[in-house]
Amino acid sequence: MARMSFVIAACQLVLGLLMTSLTESSIQNSECPQLCVCEIRPWFTPQSTYREATTVDCNDLRLTRIPSNLSSDTQVLLLQSNNIAKTVDELQQLFNLTELDFSQNNFTNIKEVGLANLTQLTTLHLEENQITEMTDYCLQDLSNLQELYINHNQISTISAHAFAGLKNLLRLHLNSNKLKVIDSRWFDSTPNLEILMIGENPVIGILDMNFKPLANLRSLVLAGMYLTDIPGNALVGLDSLESLSFYDNKLVKVPQLALQKVPNLKFLDLNKNPIHKIQEGDFKNMLRLKELGINNMGELVSVDRYALDNLPELTKLEATNNPKLSYIHRLAFRSVPALESLMLNNNALNAIYQKTVESLPNLREISIHSNPLRCDCVIHWINSNKTNIRFMEPLSMFCAMPPEYKGHQVKEVLIQDSSEQCLPMISHDSFPNRLNVDIGTTVFLDCRAMAEPEPEIYWVTPIGNKITVETLSDKYKLSSEGTLEISNIQIEDSGRYTCVAQNVQGADTRVATIKVNGTLLDGTQVLKIYVKQTESHSILVSWKVNSNVMTSNLKWSSATMKIDNPHITYTARVPVDVHEYNLTHLQPSTDYEVCLTVSNIHQQTQKSCVNVTTKNAAFAVDISDQETSTALAAVMGSMFAVISLASIAVYFAKRFKRKNYHHSLKKYMQKTSSIPLNELYPPLINLWEGDSEKDKDGSADTKPTQVDTSRSYYMW
């Protein structure tokens, strides 16, 4: 009985093969166009169901028109890589056609394809033609169309109802065209669309509610569109979306608000975007997210505290090939219980904290090879790893520092080094060494450092102010992460900003030099003198520290101020603990150079000067005019001397009186004179001295005094 069944089955198989052979022979010999291949081939439906279909393959034959003797039984017609630009009625008899491939031809208009009456067509390939627009209802006869590939064309315009009639469309490829806008009305006719690829179009931007009609969309690709921002409501309505790609755009931050509107997202691709940092809340409460890619980001420098928060289903994170990624906060992950694979290779990481790994209870594998690892206490846990975590490519894990261990394998070094505390190290690429910003903008400087124990981070401004997280200022704000925010930056805010990371082991510093509108205040000067107010007889000056050292330790041993103009030069010793002086008894409308010279306890000298002109005074007495008047009076007296002896007597009397009145100006009129001012003014000016006196006292010991910017002194 079994043998009989076997014989029957064998006969059926032979009969089937014979019928297939006869069918193929019939198609090939009597109804197959010349040079084409006609046969039964495997075919998969858009739902990936396997079938066999009568196929006519006329690919790459340089045809200029469709062959005329096609069988009406044809189900798949392949005409890829030909030179066809227009059809007549060759397709009208192909009632059973389910797939049509016109890719890589010369069509410029969809109407010229001749798609009328192809009611059974499910897949249409029109990619790599020269189509420039899609007009209203251009595909309305394709009621069963499920896949439309019209990518890599020249389409710049799509009418609002271009996809009318395509209610069964599941997959739409519009990528690599010339679209500048995305119109949500396109999708009103495609409610069942599941896959949309619209990347590599020069769109001006994504708009709110752009994809709202696509409630059944499962995959959206927005790659290579030069997008710089994603509005908060751009993804509203995509309740079924599972896969989203922003690959190769210009996003500078994670579009966290938009991502919160996609509740069922499982796969997110943010690769190759210039995102600077992943910060708190960027990936939060994404309850279905399983895989996240943040690879190949040329500007990514840090993953901050709580950057990944409450992601209960995340199993894989890839953050590789980021050349500036040098810092991952020890608390970067919070409530990420399912993470199994953590890929961090080929970055600029010096270390990864043990606490970071311990916060991931289900972690199975980690990759940190091909990073410039610092082999000290921060990664000492690797050698004492007692978990089941597998390090991928451990033989590619080498020390980059300290210098004596450079090039050694990590595990080899950590066996020798068991220290539990180590110096802070500021991440090299966390902020730029130099930058030029526009006046009035807000500037952010991100300073990140790793050490055990965790370091305190603060900043020192160009004028020596220390900025901490407790600092209250309208100009500066420091986050707990170490980011300095400078609001409404002005030219006077330019200079060298120093980040200091400090713990019990010591400190590390790094400097950023900021230009404002291309201008940089002289950063080589430790101090700079400014004119705050000018009057006819006085000048109010102040000075500021402009140093890249910590000014809390900056001490001056002496300070000297010099006032100079063509008629007078004098010098004064001033107290070292003040920043403001009022210079009085000056002449109106006169040019002066005011210089401040300070010396520190190491006898290093710094000098800053400013030129200033006093204001005009209507009733000010001009000395040169007085001198001219005096000479004229003498001449007139001589002329009238012969007239009256009495007049001569009066003249000499007045002359004698004026001489007594101006006795104190004789020295003042000497251009090269340098006088001690205590001859002219009250005893308060005994703080001052002439140039000669300054030289005598220059070597005197002066107790260093810490600079106090709150005091103001007056010179009379």
From Swiss-Prot:
Main location per the UniProt record: membrane
LRR repeats mapped onto the chain: 73-95, 96-117, 120-141, 144-165, 168-189, 192-213, 216-237, 240-261, 264-285, 313-335, 338-359
All residue ranges annotated as the Fibronectin type-III domain in the record: 525-617
Domain Ig-like C2-type: residue ranges: 424-515
Cytoplasmic side: 653-716
Pfam families: I-set, LRR_8
Residues glycosylated per entry: 96, 117, 385, 517
Entry keywords, A to Z: Disulfide bond, Glycoprotein, Immunoglobulin domain, Leucine-rich repeat, Membrane, Repeat, Signal, Transmembrane, Transmembrane helix
Cystine pairs: 447-499
Comp. bias regions, Basic and acidic residues: 691-700
Signal peptide segment: 1-25
GO cellular component, one term: extracellular matrix
Region described as Disordered: spans on this chain: 691-716
Gene3D superfamilies per UniProt: Immunoglobulins (2.60.40.10), Ribonuclease Inhibitor (3.80.10.10)
Keyword Membrane belongs to the record: yes
InterPro entries: Cys-rich_flank_reg_C (IPR000483), FN3_dom (IPR003961), FN3_sf (IPR036116), Ig-like_dom (IPR007110), Ig-like_dom_sf (IPR036179), Ig-like_fold (IPR013783), Ig_I-set (IPR013098), Ig_sub (IPR003599)
Topology of the protein relative to the lipid bilayer: Single-pass type I membrane protein
Bias (Polar residues): 702-716
Database matches in PROSITE patterns: FN3, IG_LIKE, LRR
Domain LRRCT: 371-424
Cross-referenced PANTHER family: INSULIN-LIKE GROWTH FACTOR-BINDING PROTEIN COMPLEX ACID LABILE SUBUNIT ISOFORM X1, SYNAPTIC ADHESION-LIKE MOLECULE SALM
Protein's UniProt name: Leucine-rich repeat neuronal protein 1
The gene coding this protein: LRRN1
